[in-house]
C-alpha cells in the first residue's frame, strides 16, 4: 500500500487527482490523506484522513506538514496549489531525510515556471512562439502600451507576471459591456475598458508591474505533461468550455507542435514529474504560450482516459520507481465536467 498526502484538498481538481491515484494502472492500493488551510474544505469528505494546516506562508507550515506525514506514514506528498510550491520545493531534502518523497520540481525551476514574464522570455530565447508583450510599471506606460497593441480597435490582455488562476487577468475591450450584454450574459469579471482598469489601479498606493500583450482570438489548449528519468510525454487538450478558469469540456488533440514546445521548454526550465503548459491560437492558428503550471493541473485527470495517467506517473517517479516505456496514448478522448455535490448528515458524507 502507498500512503499519499495531497495538499489543497479544497481545490476544484481534488476529486480528479484522487481518481487518478485510486485508478492507477498498477492496481496499487492507496491510502489518501488530505490537508487544507480551510477546515471546511470539501476534499475532507473524499479522503481517508483530513487535517487542517497553516497557510504556506506561515513559518510553521512545513513542520506541521511533516508531523502529519510522519503520523500517517506518508510515502509521497503531492502539492496542488501554486502558493504552496515555493515552501514545499525549498524543503524537498528536509522531507527526503525523513523518508518522504515530494512530487515537486526543484525550487529554482518552480520560481521560473511560476513567473509568466520569465516564461515569455524563455520561449523567446528558445525561438518558440509567444504573444507580443510589453512590461509596464505606470499608468502612462500602461496607456501607451495598450494603444500600441491596437486598442480600442483590438482587444488587449493585461495580467501580472506572477498570479494564481485568473487573478489579475483582464481583457481590455472598448465598450466591454452594453445593455444587451448586461441582460443576456452572465458577468465574467474579465472584460473591462482601459479607463475602468485605470480607475481600479488608481485605488492604491502603488502600481503593480503588469504584462500587456496581444489578444489571441483562437482556441485555448492545456497540455498535461510528464518528465521522468527515462521517458517524457505531453498530452494537449482543447479547452472547449471554460467556466471561471476551470475546464468544463475538453478534447484530446495530439498536436505535435505543442508537444514539442512543452517538452523543449520544460527541459530548459528543469521541470520534473507532472506539470502543465497553456497555449492559445493566434489569428493564423499558431499556438502561443500563455503560462506554465509546475504542478498537478485542475483537469489533469483527463489524461487517465487516454491511457497515460500523468499523475500516477509522477507518483511512481517520485517514489524511485521510474517508468521505462512511454504509454500508448489514445487520441479520441473527451472529458466533460458536470455539477455534483456532497451531502453531509451527522458527519456522514454522501456524494450525488
Regions found by a protein language model. Give the residues of each.
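ATP-dependent carboxylate activation and anion-phosphoryl transfer catalytic cores
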Residues: 2, 8, 72, 241-244, ...
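Phosphate-binding site of ATP-dependent enzymes
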Residues: 183-245, 252-263, 280-288
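Residues that mark the start of a beta-strand
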Residues: 1-5, 155, 211
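ATP-binding N-terminal substructure of ATP-dependent carboxylate-amine bond-forming enzymes
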Residues: 1-104
Amino acid at each position: 500500500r502507498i500512503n499519499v498526502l495531497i495538499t489543497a484538498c479544497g481545490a476544484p481538481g481534488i476529486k480528479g487527482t484522487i481518481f487518478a491515484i485510486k485508478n492507477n494502472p498498477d492496481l496499487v492500493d492507496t491510502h489518501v490523506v488530505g490537508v487544507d488551510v480551510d477546515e471546511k474544505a470539501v476534499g475532507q469528505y473524499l479522503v481517508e484522513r483530513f487535517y487542517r494546516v497553516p497557510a504556506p506562508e506561515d513559518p510553521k507550515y512545513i513542520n506541521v506538514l511533516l508531523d502529519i506525514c510522519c503520523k500517517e506514514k506518508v510515502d509521497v506528498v503531492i502539492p496542488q496549489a501554486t502558493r504552496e510550491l515555493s515552501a514545499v520545493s525549498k524543503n524537498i531534502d528536509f522531507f527526503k531525510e525523513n523518508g518522504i518523497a515530494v512530487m515537486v520540481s526543484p525550487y529554482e525551476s518552480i520560481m521560473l515556471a511560476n513567473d509568466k514574464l520569465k516564461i515569455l522570455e524563455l520561449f523567446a530565447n528558445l525561438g518558440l512562439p509567444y504573444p507580443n508583450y510589453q512590461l509596464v510599471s505606470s499608468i502612462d506606460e500602461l496607456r501607451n502600451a495598450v494603444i500600441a497593441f491596437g486598442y480600442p480597435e483590438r482587444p488587449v490582455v493585461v495580467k501580472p507576471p506572477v498570479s494564481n488562476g485568473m487573478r489579475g487577468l483582464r481583457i481590455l475591450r472598448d465598450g466591454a459591456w452594453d445593455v444587451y450584454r448586461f441582460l443576456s450574459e452572465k458577468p465574467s469579471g474579465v472584460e473591462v475598458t482601459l479607463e475602468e482598469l485605470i480607475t481600479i489601479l488608481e485605488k492604491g498606493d502603488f502600481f503593480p508591474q503588469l504584462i500587456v500583450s496581444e489578444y489571441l482570438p483562437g482556441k485555448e489548449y492545456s497540455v498535461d505533461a510528464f518528465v521522468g528519468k527515462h521517458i517524457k510525454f505531453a498530452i494537449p487538450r482543447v479547452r472547449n468550455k471554460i467556466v471561471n478558469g476551470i475546464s468544463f469540456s475538453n478534447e484530446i488533440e495530439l498536436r505535435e507542435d505543442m508537444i514539442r514546445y512543452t517538452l523543449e521548454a520544460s527541459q530548459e526550465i528543469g521541470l520534473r514529474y507532472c506539470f502543465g503548459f497553456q497555449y492559445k491560437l493566434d489569428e493564423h492558428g499558431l499556438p502561443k504560450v500563455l503560462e506554465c503550471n509546475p504542478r498537478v493541473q485542475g483537469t489533469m485527470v483527463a489524461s487517465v482516459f487516454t491511457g497515460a495517467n500523468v499523475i500516477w506517473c509522477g507518483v511512481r517517479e517520485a517514489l524511485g520507481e521510474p517508468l521505462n516505456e512511454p504509454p500508448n496514448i489514445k487520441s479520441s478522448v473527451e472529458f466533460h465536467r458536470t455539477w455534483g455535490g456532497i451531502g453531509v448528515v451527522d458527519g456522514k458524507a454522501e456524494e450525488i
